[in-house]
Every structure is written in structure tokens, then in C-alpha cells.
Amino acid sequence: MSSPRGATQTATQKATAAAPGRRADPNASLILVRLRGTVRLNGKIADTMEMLRLNRPNHAVVIPRTESYMGMVGKVKDYVAYGDIDAATMAALIKTRGRVMGDKPIDDAFVKAATADKYATVDAFAAAVASGKATMKDLGEDAKPVFRLNPPVGGFKGSTKKHFTVKGELGYRGKEINELIKRMI
């Protein structure tokens, strides 16, 4: 990843460079969990949180790893924890916290109907989302894009004001985000 002198790094390179030893699949989806509230929040960061649909603490969204999304992630990194979600955690998240309009759970029948038989089960769809081959938008407008999570069982292990690299909870966590998500489901 050497670049010519004076060239700027892309947002994806910055996010993965900040976490040495934990290089991510460039196509894998990211999960973002908002950890901090709205008090003393800069207006531009609040707008970015709204665009990401992270309006409350303990809300999570799954996003593709694109240039525009990575720019937004870079802006809100001091208020969210994010990382690479695996298929098993994604399946558990969709089954337990995924909702359709009317507050009904997402099940195999809904996934099969919404994806026009492309994915027969929630597990198959979750694997496709985790690998970046599908997005949550593929479920249509009836599926809610936000997962409302609980605070983690056992509490946060570090400060919600410090980054993960300095024994906090914020910022890029790589695959270790899956442990946090499982405790929040």
C-alpha cells in the first residue's frame, strides 16, 4: 500500500491502516454501532449520524464498504464502534433483531419472498450480506434498516470515550466487533 509522495490515502486505507494486523476483506460489509449520545455533538457529525440512520445509542446498521460510506465512517469514528461482521453473527442479528414494518420479525419466508427466491433462508442471506454480495436494501422497503440492540451483557469492557486501540470501545475493531454484537443481541 505504498503511495507516491504527497498522495492522500482513501478512507478504506485509513480505516484498515489504523488497525495493524487486522486487514479486512475489501468487499466485506461493516457493522456500525452507535455508543455515544447526542450531548455536545457537532452539527456536521449529527447530520452524518442521521444519514447513517444511527439516531440513538445502541442502534446498529450494516453498510457496504464503499468510498462514500467510508468517508462517513471516518467522520463518526469517535462516536461509534465498527468492524467486519461474520456470517454467524449477521444471521443471529437478523433473526433476533431484524424487523419488518409493523414490528414483525424477519424470517425465512420474508427473505425468500423479498429476494425473489435468490436466498431461501436467513442464513444464506446473512452470509451474502457479510461477504458484501448483498445489502440490507435487497430486502426491500418493508425491512427496517436499523437494528435496535441492548446495552452489552456485562457492560462495556473499556471506556466509551476512548478508542479500541487504547483500551476503549470506539473506532475500528475488526473481527472483534462480533463479540460485542453477540453480547448486545
Please state what every model-predicted region is.
Residues 2-185:
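Core subunits and conserved enzymes of cellular information-processing
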